Each structure stands twice: as C-alpha cells, then as structure tokens.
C-alpha cells in the first residue's frame, strides 16, 4: 500500500498544548529512566488523605510465579471526593453533566454541587440497604446521569461497583452477579436507545429467577420511562422514594490505594466471565492524567465521549478521568446516528463540544451514509477528536478528519484495553504528528515491545506480538477471585512481560500500528497477514462501507482469506464488483492478500458496543454452523442466520 501521509501537529494546537514535542521526549525518557520518581510526582495530581511514601510508589513484578502490581501502596484517598468534593469551593456551580436524551427534546444539567448532593444522598441510600465497604454492587443502567451518581456513590462508601452494559442478556447478568456475590442491583424500568425501549427491569427479573442466583437482597429501580414493570414487594425498591428526604451528608470513606474501586467483566468469547479488577489510587491517577494530556483538556471545555458507561471507556473517560479533572461531560442517552446520521453534528453544535471521543464503528457507519448529512454542520467548537475501541482504518481516519474535523482537529487514535485501565499508546495533540491508522507512540511510563513467537524482543521496523515490559498505575490487579487465571492469561505466554493479545508493527519512525488480535492473523501459505490490513484495503474502495476478514481452512494454502463485505447504501452487489474488489486488494497490498471468498453482508455480528464478534465469522467461513455458541451479547442476533444462509463455503 502507499505509505501513509503524515499530518503535522497544527501550530495553533502546539502553541497552547500542555505537552509539546520536546516536553514529550523529556517526560517520556524520565518516566522510563526513573518510574518511581516520575509517578511519585504525578501522583500529586489527585488529593490524598494519607500521602503515599516515595518508597511505596511502585512495587510491581511481572514474574508469573510471583505476580504483584501495587502503586502508591501506603497512600489513602477516596475516588468520589477526588471527582466531586475538591471542585466544590472553586467550581461548585460549574456544569458537571450536560445530558441529552435519545429524544433531543429531553435535556438535563447537573452542576458539580448538585452531582455531589445526589451522590451523597444515594450513598446514604446504599448504606441504609446494608451495603458496606468491600461489598460488590451491580449496576445495569441506561445512559442517564443516575448511572454516574450510582458509581460515585459506591466509590464514596468503599463499595465496589460492577457495571453491566444495558444490552446484555439475563444470562450475562446472572453469571456476573453470581461471580461477584452481589447483594444489591441498581437498574431502571427501561432504557431508551435509537427510539426503542430496552426492558432492563424485566431482564434483571429474569436473571434473578434463575435458581443459581441466591445472593441478591434488593433491586433499586429508577423510573426512566414510567413503564409498568413487575414488582416484588420487599425486594424491589423505588429510587425516587428512597432518595426522598435522605440526608446529603455522607463523609467519604478512607480507602487504601490498593482497595478495589470496580469490577468490569470482559465478554470473552468463551469460558466464564472474566472480572477485571481495578483499584483506587493508581487507576485514578492514570485516568486523570491520560484524560488531561491525551485530549489536551483545558478548563471550561465541553468533552463528549460517546461510549456507554458499561464499558471501560465509559468508566475511565466519561466518569473518573473527566470528573477528577473537573470537566464538563456531555452524556448522550442514545446513539449518535439516530434519528438521522446528522445527529452527531447537531449534538456537537448544540452543546459547543470541544473534544469528541468516539469509535471507528460509528465513523464507518456515518461514512456509509454519506457526507451530505453534515452539510449544515458547523463544527466550529471542535478542537480535538479521538478514536477508541479498535484500529481505525486510514480511509475512515481521513473521512473523520475532513468531514467532522474540517481538517483542523488533530485525531488521537488511542490504543488500550479494559485490562489497562487507561490509554497506553496514542498521539498527544500538541506533540506527535499523526499517520492515519497508527496509534503512534507510547504514553508516559508505558514500555511497549514487539516480540516474536519465542518472546525474543525485536528491534527497529518489525511486526510481531505487542507486549509491555513494565507496569503502569492504571493496570488491572487481578481477575476477581482467580489470580491464577490472571497470571495464565497475561503473563505466561512471554516470560516477564504483559501480553496484550494484540499484534503490532513498528515503522521506521518508531510509530506503532495495531494489526488486530493475534488470533486475527491469517497464515496464508506460510505468510502471516493481519486481518486489519486486508479490511483497511477493502474499506478504502468507494463502494465498501465495512469489511470483516477471517481465515478459513484452505486445501492448498492452509488458510484462505474470507471477506464479509457491507456495501455503501447506493452500491449494488454483483460478481463484477466482487472481482473488482479482489483486484483492488491485490493492488493495494499484494497478490498474497487477495481474498479467496467475498460474501456480501447486509450486517455484521456486533456486540452492542460495536465490536465485531469474529468467532462467529470464523465458524461460518469454516462451514461449522451447527454449534456457534452463545449469541446473547450481539446487538442483532438475526444477522447470524442471514450470514449462514448466504455463506460461500458450503460443502
């Protein structure tokens, strides 16, 4: 493929940025040379009840037999008071949450003082239900301000929140509740998303009807739509009734830096849910610091992260990072392309959004609809734009840059994981020139390496497995209740290294390009080929909206290349177009990457967060369609039936 264009740092950004290129180089070197001193200084960005000692800043070992990750270990603090109380004196009247409903006519605002009051009240509600420090509280909520209230209320009293994305099934709820032995669930009657209601309370009822769920005493229900829902007297409690007249005085619990803050279950494709455990001190320092520097956040800016609170992005970059920094956060209940693709631009203009953080899935969906939907979009307020969730293909990057950013907003293409707590590799807007499709360089204190299959570190411009050689404060501490699984999953593949599970290549400028999950590598005739590269080539064709590529058993090559292709709305599928796309990929990458089979797909199997579930695609491509496994986490399970019916590899 043609070498990507480099987009220099805009001078109007670098002139006023927190971090310019020289500062980045100096700080990064200091963070690697002496992490204890570096993080000892950075830890001061949040408030501590008992300050940590310099000798306790970093106590970490990546040895799978002696695995331990501790940061600021003797310090004490409270995450809720860092997100709320410390802003009250100077910024109590500042807007903390700007909320827009699925229907744009519904708007709410909460100042930091109002948010603080509600959090303290709800913390007292939880205490009255017998919730104490260390208890796990499950949240299954719509995207409303009360979701943030409930999270911060848990943190205030030292309870550990476990947020389940509002699209997950009763089975998913049950397995997570059982694993965390949760006594209390917080939910709503219904959620609203893209004009449809989501039966949250009904799903909770179904989950709790399973004989295996015996730990839950109470379900607190917020009225979102006012729908009639089944009510179990004694167990089910009304949010508004509980909040009426309750005291707003609730001192924050003193927590050790290594006390758990939250659990977040990753929806692994197989096996039991994996409870990723994050603790209080290191996580909060890292979330606040990455939010400030990666987005070059300035006081009084409006910041919009389109992620749902049920994902790590919602935790780190809609709640904890922004609120620790005293930001004004836009929260949107629905999806930013409903009722029309113009919605994203309308929200940006209506609320004068300065920083936008969204996912490639949404960008590609908007791209497929056509840029004419943004003809009336001003975008004057936008300064920084971000991308999260998966590698963004260069074509979508350029579209985002031109149509949404009007070619003047730097794009921070951020790479990180639920397990990392915060962003690990990303441009800093005032410091690092960007290349479409590259996450560029590591954040401070982050020590990436590329290794071969034996764990040998590769230098220079190479491709291989992405690992981290040292810890950072936001790193997960364990898999809840299963430390052996933590060691096995992340530290046993490559000795003394954290294995991300992703492949990457590093170019001659030292920039990192994420090539996708290592299990998304196809071995064609002995040559390794990243699926992301083939997908990017396909999507670069003007008639392709989205593509997913997997390997399938091939009699001659070992693995062949099977592409699922969604066309833009006015394109017609044909055999001629199929051949054109094969030649297109051949020209873009080389003969080796030519897809063997191209299946037209009206939709792809995605989770509700927009991640493509490739295990289904791999099985369909391999003609293994009798036992596909659980599809309850898919946004639209019917997509699977359509793909099976039109599969190309039937024997």
UniProtKB/Swiss-Prot annotation:
GO cellular component: cytosol
Key words of the record: Acetylation, ATP-binding, Ligase, Magnesium, Metal-binding, Nucleotide-binding
The organism's place on the tree of life at top rank: Bacteria
Gene Ontology terms for molecular function: acetate-CoA ligase activity; AMP binding; ATP binding; metal ion binding
InterPro entries: Ac_CoA_lig, ACAS_N, AMP-bd_C, AMP-bd_C_sf, AMP-binding_CS, AMP-dep_synth/lig_dom, ANL_N_sf
Post-translational modification: Acetylated. Deacetylation by the SIR2-homolog deacetylase activates the enzyme.
Catalytic activities: acetate + ATP + CoA = acetyl-CoA + AMP + diphosphate
Binding site for ATP: 389-391, 413-418, 502, 517, 528
Required cofactor names: Mg(2+)
Any single biological process term in GO: acetyl-CoA biosynthetic process from acetate
Enzyme Commission identifier(s): 6.2.1.1
N6-acetyllysine modified-residue sites: 611
Residues involved in CoA binding: 193-196, 313, 337, 525, 586
Residues the entry annotates as binding Mg(2+): 539, 541, 544
Function noted in UniProt: Catalyzes the conversion of acetate into acetyl-CoA (AcCoA), an essential intermediate at the junction of anabolic and catabolic pathways. AcsA undergoes a two-step reaction. In the first half reaction, AcsA combines acetate with ATP to form acetyl-adenylate (AcAMP) intermediate. In the second half reaction, it can then transfer the acetyl group from AcAMP to the sulfhydryl group of CoA, forming the product AcCoA.
Family: Belongs to the ATP-dependent AMP-binding enzyme family.
This protein's name: Acetyl-coenzyme A synthetase
Organism of provenance: Shewanella denitrificans (strain OS217 / ATCC BAA-1090 / DSM 15013)
């Amino acid at each position: 493929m043609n070498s990507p264009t480099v987009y220099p740092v805009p001078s109007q950004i670098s002139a006023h940025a927190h971090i310019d290129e020289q500062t980045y180089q100096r700080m990064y070197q200091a963070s690697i040379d002496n992490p204890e001193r570096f993080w000892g200084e950075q830890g001061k960005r949040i408030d501590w009840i008992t300050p940590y000692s310099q000798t306790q800043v970093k106590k970490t070992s990546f040895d799978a037999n002696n695995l331990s990750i501790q940061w600021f270990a003797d310090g004490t603090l409270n995450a809720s008071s860092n997100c709320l109380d410390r802003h009250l004196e100077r910024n109590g009247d500042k807007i903390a949450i700007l909320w827009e409903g699925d229907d744009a006519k519904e708007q709410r605002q909460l100042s930091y003082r109002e948010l603080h009051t509600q959090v303290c009240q709800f913390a007292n509600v939880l205490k009255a239900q017998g919730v104490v420090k260390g208890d796990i509280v499950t949240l299954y909520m719509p995207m409303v301000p009360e979701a943030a209230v409930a999270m911060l209320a848990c943190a205030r009293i030292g309870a550990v929140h476990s947020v389940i994305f509002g699209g997950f099934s009763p089975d998913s709820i049950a397995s997570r509740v059982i694993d965390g032995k949760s006594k209390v669930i917080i939910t709503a009657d219904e959620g609203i998303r893209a004009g449809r209601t989501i039966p949250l309370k009904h799903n909770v009822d179904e989950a709790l009807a399973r004989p295996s769920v015996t730990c839950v005493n109470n379900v607190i229900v917020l009225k979102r739509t006012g729908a009639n829902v089944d009510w179990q007297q004694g167990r089910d409690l009304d949010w508004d009734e509980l909040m009426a007249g309750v005291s707003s005085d609730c001192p924050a619990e003193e927590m050790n830096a290594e006390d758990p803050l939250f659990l977040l279950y990753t929806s692994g494709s197989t096996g039991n849910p994996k409870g990723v455990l994050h603790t209080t001190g290191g996580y909060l320092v890292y979330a606040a610091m990455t939010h400030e520097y990666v987005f070059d956040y300035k006081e009084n800016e409006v910041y919009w992260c389109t992620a749902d609170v049920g994902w790590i992005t919602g935790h780190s970059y809609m709640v904890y990072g922004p609120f620790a920094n005293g930001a004004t956060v836009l929260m949107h209940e629905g999806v930013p392309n409903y009722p029309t693709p113009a919605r994203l631009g309308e929200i940006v203009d209506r609320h004068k959004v300065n920083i936008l953080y969204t996912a490639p899935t949404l960008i590609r969906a908007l791209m497929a609809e056509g840029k004419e939907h943004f003809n009336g979009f001003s975008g004057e307020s936008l300064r920084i734009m971000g991308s999260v969730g998966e590698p963004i293909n260069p074509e979508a990057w350029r579209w985002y840059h031109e149509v949404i950013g009007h070619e003047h907003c730097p794009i921070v293409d951020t790479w990180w994981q639920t397990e990392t707590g915060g962003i690990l590799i990303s441009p800093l807007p005032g410091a690092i020139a960007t290349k479409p499709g590259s996450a560029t360089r590591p954040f401070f204190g982050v020590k990436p390496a590329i290794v071969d299959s034996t764990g040998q570190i590769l230098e220079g411009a190479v491709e291989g497995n992405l690992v981290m050689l040292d810890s950072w404060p936001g790193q997960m501490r364990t898999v809840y209740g299963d430390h052996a699984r933590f060691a096995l999953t992340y530290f046993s593949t490559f000795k003394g290294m954290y294995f991300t599970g992703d492949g990457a290549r590093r170019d001659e400028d030292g920039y990192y390009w994420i090539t996708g999950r290592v299990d998304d590598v196809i071995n064609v005739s002995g040559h390794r080929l990243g699926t992301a590269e083939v997908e990017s080539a396909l999507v670069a064709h003007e008639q392709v909206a989205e593509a997913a590529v997997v390997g399938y058993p091939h009699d001659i090559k070992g693995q062949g290349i099977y592409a699922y292709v969604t066309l833009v709305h006015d394109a017609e599928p044909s055999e001629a177009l199929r051949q054109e796309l094969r030649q297109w990929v051949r020209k873009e990458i080389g003969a080796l990457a030519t897809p063997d089979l191209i299946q037209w797909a009206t939709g792809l199997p995605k989770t509700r967060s927009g991640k493509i579930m490739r295990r289904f695609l791999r099985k369909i491509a391999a003609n293994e369609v009798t036992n596909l496994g659980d599809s309850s986490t898919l946004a639209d399970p019917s997509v699977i039936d359509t793909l099976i019916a039109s599969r190309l590899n039937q024997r």
